[in-house]
């Protein structure tokens, strides 16, 4: 069993007995309903020379039950000190409990890694619960820029992480294929079509899409229709162009996502919601719940009175669910608003029976968080669905030390394809996970082409390659040691140097780290972990240049060599597993 999982279970048993004893001796009735399952958090030590694992459980119980945290910490120490895998327990600060784990417990964990059974520690976390993850969902009005890649990679890796931990996952893309922006797209394409027919450069008015990426769409229309569209009225030619334009750009988006290994199971059309009359039915349902009314909105903050004309309109009572204002359901022309479409789309997700619904939004959509929460609360009366909304912050593309400004509307942006052709899929995917999703990320094209520690994916892949080279050399030059290793007879207790044990401790935290990553929807933890593992392995490798005793292959000591071959194999196994989840290639030679 994983050391962290075992320690957590043992702490839980002791915590439950302590809480129950405190309840039985307390006169206060407020403790009667206290939940026994206070969360147990285990943290790996940042100072491996003093202790291995720490917990603040005593402080949490003390706060909830008005007790002295140091006294409770010492009680934990007394009850846990006799466990055979625990070498020592110390109390620090206001009540942190620090554990030193027996060396044998760490080294024995290598066997669990080598036989692959470590995956069982997290493969059933999800218990087959159904999850819908919606990510990217960029309007099909142009190619995806590098900023879109962040939500794309985050969503794709989160989906893989959930799948490998026992969830049933649907990867979804919501296609906004109707509305004003699609009208503007179609008008822009029409001008490019005229350009192809007449040979005269198109004059693109402000508010439309001037990007040259639409020239090919216009040319294709000219080849298919000739000059026929020039004879039609605007409503007639726009009706033809809309579907062609959306389909062309959606196919382009899918192709760009495929370049960086991102996929979706479902592309859900907003237009179909409008065409099927579903929106009206959902609004009627909310009306029955008395959540819809006709009223007037207050003047938006910052808008001039000269430009504001209050009007009676159909509104959704989103403020009762914590939103900052009620939301309009219809536009001035009587058609349904984007918000009304969002309600119908959310209702569709709920009816598909998902246990979790995850929305991944860009930083420019932070304002949607409160309204999405209001929608789900209004529709999901039984609270059958758990909602989570994740925000992916901006990506600042850096070229030659200067930030590149991007705007799809102006036609000035760096596409995913541009960056892919410069650095490749693996660099894009890994680097998008080097910071938490809600932190701004600087994407430096120059540094990410270097074969150095500044290029994190190279650094991790190189650790995998180095470990593989050790095994190949041993197979050729240390036959006896390789035979001991390959027949699973390695003596792990021989791995006793401080550096070897530090590396093993990092390997042992993999399952614990992954448990936290999936439960918090934070796949960036995997990338951070892999960098730490690679750094520790490279550090151990480099020691041989100063001290030959640190060589992985010690020709006069077959048993030690066999043990170190097992260690190198364990490093490769965990790196392989981590890169597989992130969707990055494991290379054998660099």
Swiss-Prot record:
Protein name listed in UniProt: Arginine--tRNA ligase
Top-level taxon: Bacteria
UniProt catalytic activity: tRNA(Arg) + L-arginine + ATP = L-arginyl-tRNA(Arg) + AMP + diphosphate
SUPFAM superfamilies tied to this protein: Anticodon-binding domain of a subclass of class I aminoacyl-tRNA synthetases, Arginyl-tRNA synthetase (ArgRS), N-terminal 'additional' domain, Nucleotidylyl transferase
Keyword hit for Nucleotide-binding: yes
Species this protein is from: Orientia tsutsugamushi (strain Ikeda)
GO annotation (BP), single: arginyl-tRNA aminoacylation
Keywords, comma-separated and alphabetical: Aminoacyl-tRNA synthetase, ATP-binding, Cytoplasm, Ligase, Nucleotide-binding, Protein biosynthesis
Keyword Aminoacyl-tRNA synthetase belongs to the record: yes
Name of the top EC class for this enzyme: ligase
Main location: cytoplasm
Assembly: Monomer.
Family (UniProt): Belongs to the class-I aminoacyl-tRNA synthetase family.
UniProt xrefs under HAMAP family: Arg_tRNA_synth (MF_00123)
GO molecular function list: arginine-tRNA ligase activity; ATP binding
NCBIfam families per record: argS
Chain's gene name: argS
Localization per Swiss-Prot or TrEMBL: Cytoplasm
Pfam families to which the protein is assigned, alphabetical: Arg_tRNA_synt_N, DALR_1, tRNA-synt_1d
Gene Ontology cellular component terms for the protein in this record: cytoplasm
EC number: 6.1.1.19
Disulfide bonds: none
InterPro entries noted in UniProt: aa-tRNA-synth_I_CS (IPR001412), Arg-tRNA-ligase (IPR001278), Arg-tRNA-synth_N (IPR005148), Arg-tRNA-synth_N_sf (IPR036695), ArgRS_core (IPR035684), DALR_anticod-bd (IPR008909), Rossmann-like_a/b/a_fold (IPR014729), tRNAsynth_Ia_anticodon-bd (IPR009080)
